[in-house]
Amino acid sequence: MGPFCLGCSHRKCYSPIRNLISQETFKFHFKNLGYAKGRKDTFLCYEVTRKDCDSPVSLHHGVFKNKGNIHAEVCFLYWFHDKVLKVLSPREEFKITWYMSWSPCFECAEQIVRFLATHHYLSLDIFSSRLYNVQDPETQQNLCRLVQEGAQVAAMDLYEFKKCWKKFVTMVAGDSGLGKRLLTNFRYQDSKLQEILRRMDPLSEEEFYSQFYNQRVKHLCYYHRMKPYLCYQLEQFNGQAPLKGCLLSEKGKQHAEILFLDKIRSMELSQVTITCYLTWSPCPNCAWRLAAFKRDRPDLILHIYTSRLYFHWKRPFQKGLCSLWQSGILVDVMDLPQFTDCWTNFVNPKRPFWPWKGLEIISRRTQRRLRRIKESWGLQDLVNDFGNLQLGPPMS
C-alpha cells in the first residue's frame, strides 16, 4: 500500500485519557528496564506545537493509552487527524513530540511512516523509554524507515525523562520519581537502538573507497574482501522525499539484489524511478530475478550502475546481463558523476568526493567491455532504444 492519511481511513475518534498521569503509573510503565515484565500497556505523552513567526506555540499536550489492541501511537494519529488537521490550516507546520513507554511495534511504525509520508509539513520526535521486540527484523527495518522518513527516534535520556516528568506527571513535593539506574538503563537501550540505526547509515568513507574501488587489485586476499554492496534511491512521482538505503550481501545468505527486491515489494509501489549503485554487477540468478520483477512492473523505471563487472567473461553472467536489458532495466558502468552522486547520497554530503587515480580511465575501459557484451549478443539497438526513453512520470 502507498502513503495514505490514516485518519481518513478510520471513522472512530480516540481521545487522550488525561493531561497528566500519576507518579505510580509513570514509575511503573516508563521504567527503562532491559526486561520489563508485566508492562503490556503502551503510554504516550505528547505535545503538539505550531510555528508562529518562527517561534513554537504549544497547541496541545496530553497522554494516550492503548485501547485494547490499538496502540497509543495509532490512537494519537486518529485523534490528531480529527482534532488538529481538520480544524487548523492544512498548510501550517507542526512539530510533534512523543514520550513513549515502548517504542513502536513494526505495524505501528509502518503506519507512522505512511502518515508522515502523506503529511510533509509535520516533524516528529519519538523518545522511548524501552525498545519493543527489537530482535524482530521487521521491527528493526521499520524503525530505520521512520528515520528515513524524517522522524527523530531516540531513547529517553535523563534530560528527556525530566522534561516528561515535569510536564506530564502529577507532582508531589520532595519526590523526584526518576529512580535509580536510569542512566545505566538508558545506555543499554541507547546502544541497542544505535546498533539498529547504524545498519541503515550511509557507508563510511573508508568502506566506500575500498568497496567501490573500480580498478584491478594485485593481491588476491584483498580482492576477496571486496563485498557486494547495493545502494538504492527511490523517487516517486507524487513529490515525496526520496527513499534511500544501502544493502550488503552476507556470506552464505541472500545477495543484496534479492534483499532489495524484498524491500521494494513490501512497499507495494508503482510509477517510481529507482537508481541503484552496485559494487559488482549481478550474478545470473539475481539478474533473472531482477528482470522478472521489472517485467511485472512496466511502469517502474530501474537504472543500475555498477562499479565492476562480475565474471563478465563467462557466458552465463553475460546472459544474465542480457536478461536485464531485455526486461527494460538500464545497466551502465559507474563513472565520475555516478561515483560523486553515490558519495553525496550515501557517504558524506558535506565533504567532496576525491576520485582515486585512474578512476575515469578504468570506467571507460569497463564501459567498452560492457558495450562489447551488448554487441556480441545483438542487443545494442535495443539498449539504445531503452536509453532514449523519457525518465519521468507518465504523460496525462
Curated annotation (Swiss-Prot):
Residues 38-154, 205-324 form the CMP/dCMP-type deaminase domain. GO terms for molecular function: cytidine deaminase activity; RNA binding; zinc ion binding. The keyword Nucleotide-binding does not apply. Pfam families: APOBEC2 (PF18772), NAD2 (PF18782). Its main location: cytoplasm. It is found in: Cytoplasm. InterPro entries: APOBEC/CMP_deaminase_Zn-bd, APOBEC_Cyt_Deaminase, CMP_dCMP_dom, Cytidine_deaminase-like. Zn(2+) binds at H71, C105, C108, H255, C283, C286. Its EC number is 3.5.4.38. It catalyses: a 2'-deoxycytidine in single-stranded DNA + H2O + H(+) = a 2'-deoxyuridine in single-stranded DNA + NH4(+). Its cofactor is Zn(2+). The active site is at E73. The CMP/dCMP deaminase domain 1 confers deoxycytidine deaminase activity, whereas the CMP/dCMP deaminase domain 2 mediates RNA-dependent oligomerization and virion incorporation. DNA deaminase (cytidine deaminase) which acts as an inhibitor of retrovirus replication and retrotransposon mobility via deaminase-dependent and -independent mechanisms. Selectively targets single-stranded DNA and does not deaminate double-stranded DNA or single- or double-stranded RNA. Belongs to the cytidine and deoxycytidylate deaminase family. Homodimer. This is DNA dC->dU-editing enzyme APOBEC3. It comes from Cricetulus longicaudatus (Long-tailed dwarf hamster). The gene is APOBEC3.
